[in-house]
A protein has these predicted regions:
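Acyl-donor binding region in acyl/amide transferases
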Residues: 30-186
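Residues that flank catalytic or metal-binding motifs in active/ligand-binding sites
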Residues: 5-7, 21, 61
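A short helix-loop-beta-strand connector motif used in the catalytic cores of GNAT acetyltransferases and
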Residues: 2-9, 33-34
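Conserved beta-strand in the GNAT
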Residues: 10, 17-26
């Protein structure tokens, strides 16, 4: 076990007296200031090589978000109302973490895209993220580089207006929703 174990955000339904779901997280400051090696101790370290700049300038002010989960009764496919309740309360819990760790400026973590997710839709999502949120500082590098085709019509669907990033991002996000729905994904 690590000297700095992950913590769990637990979402509780007081009316049903049961756990709804949770989120695993770790305070980067405890890892950065600890005896261990962040590259070995953090889940993201198994997938990404951290830069010196990340370890020194970002990790002490970051929360790594790990695996989130929702128990079966609260899955949207089982009960849409309970599914919305679960998601809303997990987001409220993340808000509580923001308030509790007020010196944290960055939240990061990995996202799992299952093989069953349409490959074309996945390529659009990944190109969208890389287009609007590039790692310009080279803070992390994948240990295993994934093949990602660059889509020729990227600029057409995902405009970037440096004078009004918010508006161009919203337009790109709407376009992403349309593109992924064409492949049966949301």
């Amino acid at each position: 076990l690590s000297d700095n174990p992950y913590q769990q955000l637990i979402v509780w339904n007081p009316e049903e007296e049961e756990i709804v779901g949770g989120y695993r997280f770790i305070d980067g400051a405890t890892v950065a200031g600890g005896k261990g090696n962040p590259q070995d101790d953090l889940s993201m370290g198994h997938y990404f090589q951290f830069s010196k700049q990340f370890l020194e300038d970002y990790l002490p002010y970051s929360i790594e978000l790990g695996r989130s989960w929702v128990q079966p009764k609260y899955q949207p496919a089982v009960d849409p109302r309970k599914g919305m309740f679960a998601l809303d309360n997990i987001w409220d819990g993340l808000g509580a973490i923001v308030l509790k760790y007020e010196n944290m400026r960055h939240f990061y973590g990995k996202v799992t895209m299952y093989p069953s997710y349409d490959r074309n839709a996945r390529n659009w999502v990944l190109n969208f993220l890389g287009h609007y949120f590039p790692d310009a500082e080279g803070l992390m590098h994948p240990i295993v580089q994934a093949e990602l085709p660059k889509l020729p019509e990227l600029e057409q669907h995902f405009p970037i207006d440096q004078t009004d990033f918010s508006t161009s991002f919203k337009k790109g996000l709407r376009n992403l929703g349309k593109l992924t729905s064409e492949f049966g994904e949301s």
